[in-house]
Amino acid sequence: MRTFSDDIGWGDLWVKRPHNSTPTPWLDSLRDKGKRHGLRNGVTHNFAVGSVGGLPFEEITFAQVLQDSGYYTAMIGKWHLGHNGSYSPVHRGFDYYYGIPYSNDMGCTDKPGLDLPTCPPCMHGQYTAGKHEQCYSKVALPLFENETIVEQPLDTWSLKERYAAAAVKQIKTSVSRKQPFLLYVALAHMHVPLFHNPFFNVTTQAPYTASLSDMDSLVGTIMEAVSTEQLENTLIWFTGDNGPWEQKCQFSGNVGPFVGRWQTSRGGGSAKRTTWEGGHRVPTVVAWPKKIKPNSTSNALLSGMDIFPTILSLAGVKPPSDRRYDGMDITDILLNDSNSGHKSIMHPNSGAAGQFGDLQTVRLKHHKAFYITGGSEACGGGSGQQHYHQPPLIFDLSQDEAEEAPLNPDSDEYRFVLREVVKESAALLLDIATDKVSTANYRTDPAAVPCCQNPICRCHSLK
């Protein structure tokens, strides 16, 4: 079972913070049962409400591989890899899908959640540009079951309960079918607009804190279902996609000590959309009874790309041999306390300075080289001037986790690290040039916008 949180901060969980004592008992118990990691994540682009394409068909998902190997596969939540036609999750390896096809801020609702700026509710008549100009889309946010829109606009304030019920139902379905199962839960938490159980005491809990507690409760419901069905041989992998969206101010999470001070002291953000540590270091825990040592921690350098080969390895399933894989199998790290992670990881631009896909940062063990900085908005505005660094800024994270003071370019340490960075980058570019590379179609078309009933896009068929 893989659970994916959206826009969660590294400092939101499992660290001592004097100003926030958010109770997350279920995630704490998962931590105590498993092994903690920090994963580095990032994408180069995502898909729009009107996208005609999605994840290229040449690419294979781990759900497809497991499905072909006899697993019952279900997905709950955010897909965001294409919703039009054959790009739907049910055509990409999942037997069942229930969720929002993209981010929960990419459409209006009748009862908007908490966001900055505040977005208006959907209008039943003619939309006016002025009311929606600062929001992503005036099209109502859809809720899908498989390929059918069952509610539009969906009620986000009851989404947690519906996601929990759907997840529990799919676990029971796998038991009744006597199949091993893959359950992928891609949460709307902690992405804006925030929503939470109305019974949480928001007079003592800030909205973000209440939403975090809400997320913990959802994870707990799923964990209880696994226990109730006596599925002891179930691996649970909790992680996030990227750091908090700091321009959302009080509605965003905490980066912990990874503040990207070099950038913030010059204006601009250092969290989501950036390759500063706060932008792509996320809390991660993997638990598997009697297999993974409880309450343990790994400092190995890992990536979200490692999930694909590792899940298949743990399931005893081999991936297709006609391609290369960017991630590494971390089974030895999970089961045998190895700390042999990646030597280097390349981080492309994912929405801040530079062009999508530009090589922005290279991580080499505990050093990190920045070729591009700036371009991401901070709380209160200001994105910092875009800079191309040649030679790059290099930080030693073992001594400077806040990324405040780059190494002196004239130092022996800098020159040694730079040589290694150049060597690793060249090897990656050669690997890309000699491998099969797919190209996504980012074209948009109004006809591809999810709409259950033209032209108003409004329906409710939930029972």
Descriptions of predicted regions:
Residues D400:
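Acidic carboxylate motifs that coordinate Ca2+ or other divalent cations, activating on Asp/Glu
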Residues M1-P392, E403-K423, A427-T434, A440-K463:
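Formylglycine-dependent sulfatase
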